[in-house]
């Protein structure tokens, strides 16, 4: 029984029911991620793992680059780790990427954000520091009084009021003493992705294509182990690129088209060999010789717009 595949299908169905536009499961060429979904301004790049301990650092640079460029959030959905099943309502991390159980994620997209996370040393509660300070002052408690009552340092109280998290046992004492819920929801959409290591582009043709697009004024990000090869973009336009060295794989082009529809990007096929086809499955096709002859970004955009099918 393929538990991971079953979980992907289960997640796909749940996202559809919750109003998301979702890329289809089982699309050709998926390795780095499993699903991409969008609902209004919410965009998630999802990796599904049965055991989260198998999450490798190898795909992180591509995930982070993709999230940064498309303004999406990365989330790993898992069932278990080496220490047991993932607990519902708890946020986990691997390599700075947030991880949740299926139920926790469904609760999250329905407005119930987790406020407890797992980290070295146990579970921690995210505290609303401003609220804690306000309630302490309303009750007339000094920092010294509260620290003495809880048996912790004054510095710890100051840290909590500055937004630091507390262990569950300390948090429960705080809540009991102040008589208020002090938890603060954790919004994974606020995660910042710092990826300093870019994947080397080993394919000479792909590297040459990006260099030519860069010469026209486009920025780019290479994405490995996905149906598309990366993104090329300026402030107004973003292309999802499929770069084909020889023959064009129909299944891969269909995958690029469907994923681009979710992210609202323009799917663009760059072909090494000249072809009379200007559009395949709704994706504009440009040969490398045509790209090489482009004298400006404006001319290139006009060529792509002419060949782009919006249906």
UniProtKB/Swiss-Prot annotation:
It comes from the Archaea. The keyword Phosphoprotein does not apply. SMART domains: HTH_XRE (SM00530). GO terms for molecular function: DNA binding; DNA-binding transcription factor activity. Residues 143-162 bind DNA. PROSITE patterns: HTH_CROC1. The keyword Isomerase does not apply. It holds the Pfam family HTH_3. HAMAP family: HTH_type_cro_C1. This is Putative HTH-type transcriptional regulatory protein PTO0557. It comes from Picrophilus torridus (strain ATCC 700027 / DSM 9790 / JCM 10055 / NBRC 100828 / KAW 2/3). The lineage of its organism: Archaea, Methanobacteriati, Thermoplasmatota, Thermoplasmata, Thermoplasmatales.
